[in-house]
């Protein structure tokens, strides 16, 4: 199975969940928040198609501490591929955070069962914050799942 990604930032983020994290930006977004910091990830056609098996292998080799945040774009647009990727990363013992602009209720239970952190809610420019950890606006919720 393939997945469409925008980019990967290896082992350098302190703002996308606890610890130093790698961030996988998935391609495609149905929310398109005003003030989005990653508009290049909006159009699904602009992404790079990769095999999930190849991607998981690359992440396993390059992510030093096994901490990854899956962001976007909007990861839930590729729900089936996202589930498969999370399953593979779980086998490799990754600490997984998922960032979605959707509500918690829209995140499939099979995903919630396999991640450690979840950030929900779309970015609202008027509620932008730099003091609430791991979120961009005050309406967003960051929670530890397990």
Per-range role (PLM):
Residues 1-25, 34, 38-44:
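N-terminal [4Fe-4S]-dependent radical SAM core
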Residues 116-124:
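Non-cysteine beta-strand/loop elements that form the S-adenosyl-L-methionine
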């Amino acid at each position: 199975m393939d997945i469409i990604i925008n980019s990967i930032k290896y082992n350098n983020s302190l703002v996308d969940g606890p610890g130093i994290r790698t961030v996988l930006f998935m391609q495609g977004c149905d929310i398109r928040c005003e003030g989005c910091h990653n508009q290049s990830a909006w159009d699904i056609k602009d992404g790079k198609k990769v095999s999930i098996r190849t991607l998981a292998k690359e992440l396993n080799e390059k992510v030093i501490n096994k901490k990854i945040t899956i962001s976007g774009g909007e990861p839930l647009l590729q729900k089936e591929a996202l589930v498969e990727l999370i399953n593979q990363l779980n086998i490799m013992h990754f600490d997984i955070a998922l960032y979605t602009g959707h509500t918690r209720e829209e995140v499939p239970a099979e995903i919630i069962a396999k991640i450690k952190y979840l950030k929900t809610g779309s970015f609202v420019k008027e509620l932008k914050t730099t003091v609430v950890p791991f979120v961009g606006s005050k309406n967003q919720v960051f929670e530890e799942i397990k």
